[in-house]
């Protein structure tokens, strides 16, 4: 379990401290997509508080037991096997809802575009329907992808609108996330649902799934194995990245302190780097090298064509939140924790 490692325990404690989530005491938080990169860390953080009830859902009970099974003995924790494309049971209630269930890696966009689109749209709708019934607050986890492609050197503020190529396989993810955000605002306007949106940059960390095909995850996986880091492009793309601990802390901070019907970018300007620099950092930490290779056609179809995707985080910083980790620190911690778990 991740919680066995002292650095991960420190990360979880950092997330609880930075997020300032004392007002969650005695409340129930529902998290869908509980076994994913963010879901695992989020649940570990909520359970660390000691006075928050957590309902976690996912499609695989076996995966849940393997990744968040340390909480099963707690009376404050419950896991329910559930498909996010289906409505929630009428008996379910919660004070806060965080619908994380989503396909978030390129191979899924290429091989399962229909499922990628439907889980984003239907998952958001069913979460919002539950919020109407329970008078719950929704924190919707969105993505930098909703901005489309930047014009020149532009940085994405929350009101930015870029261009998007609908003819690519990847549009199943970006357009369905845009639709889900529109649903959030529609439910806020029509039904009075309290909803805040967290637009995440590219998130990485030790809780990533072994099947994750994002470039950053592949770099880190190979680093943990002591292998050379394979870069399948020139690596000149400039992106915002966020360590998973900072992402979880920011999400909870937005949920508790953000304004209703408002979107907040989650990024860390210390982690705005080119893809080749991320690869080199992973190689340096692992004592290996960066090598270049060509992607397969299936891989290429799911790749982002964006050359620049930098999130402006000033709106988030104005709420008092501050990220904690540099790129080097985050990569080192990820490799350290994953190396321990491989033993």
Q: Where in this protein do the model-derived segments appear?
A:
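N-terminal Rossmann NAD(P)H-binding glycine-rich loop of SDR-like oxidoreductase domains
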Residues: 30-48
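Conserved glycine-rich Rossmann-like NAD(P)H-binding loop of the short-chain dehydrogenase/reductase
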Residues: 51-63
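NAD(P)-dependent short-chain dehydrogenase/reductase
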Residues: 151-159, 182-239, 244-255, 280-285
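Active-site helix of classical SDR
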Residues: 172, 176
């Amino acid at each position: 379990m991740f919680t066995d490692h002292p650095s991960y325990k420190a990360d979880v404690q950092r997330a609880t401290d930075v997020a300032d989530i004392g007002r969650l005491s005695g409340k129930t938080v529902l998290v869908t997509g509980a076994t994913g990169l963010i879901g695992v860390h989020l649940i570990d953080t909520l359970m660390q508080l000691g006075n928050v009830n957590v309902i976690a859902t996912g499609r695989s009970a076996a995966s849940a037991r393997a990744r968040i099974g340390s909480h099963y003995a707690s009376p404050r924790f419950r896991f329910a096997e559930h498909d996010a494309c289906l409505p929630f049971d009428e008996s379910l209630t919660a004070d806060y809802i965080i619908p994380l269930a989503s396909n978030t890696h390129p191979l899924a966009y290429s091989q399962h575009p229909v499922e990628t689109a439907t889980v984003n749209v239907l998952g958001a709708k069913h979460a919002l329907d539950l919020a109407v019934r329970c008078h719950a607050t929704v924190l919707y986890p969105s993505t930098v992808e909703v901005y489309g492609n930047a014009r020149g050197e532009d940085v994405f503020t929350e009101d930015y609108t870029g261009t998007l190529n609908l003819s690519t396989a990847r549009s199943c993810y970006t357009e369905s996330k845009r639709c889900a955000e529109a649903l959030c605002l529609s439910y806020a306007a029509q039904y009075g649902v309290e909803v805040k949106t967290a637009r995440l940059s590219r998130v990485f960390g030790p809780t990533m799934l072994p099947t994750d095909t994002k470039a950053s995850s592949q770099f880190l996986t190979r680093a943990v194995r002591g292998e050379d880091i394979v870069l399948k492009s020139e690596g000149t793309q400039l992106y915002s990245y966020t360590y998973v601990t900072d992402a979880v802390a920011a999400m909870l901070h937005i949920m508790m302190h953000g304004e209703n019907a408002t979107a907040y970018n989650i990024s860390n300007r210390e982690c705005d780097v080119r893809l080749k620099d991320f690869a080199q950092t992973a190689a340096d930490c692992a004592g290996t090298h960066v090598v270049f290779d060509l992607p397969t056609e299936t891989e290429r179809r799911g790749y982002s064509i964006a050359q620049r995707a930098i999130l402006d985080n000033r709106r988030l910083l104005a709420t008092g939140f501050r990220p904690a980790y540099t790129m080097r620190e985050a990569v080192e911690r990820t490799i350290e924790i994953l190396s321990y778990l491989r033993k």
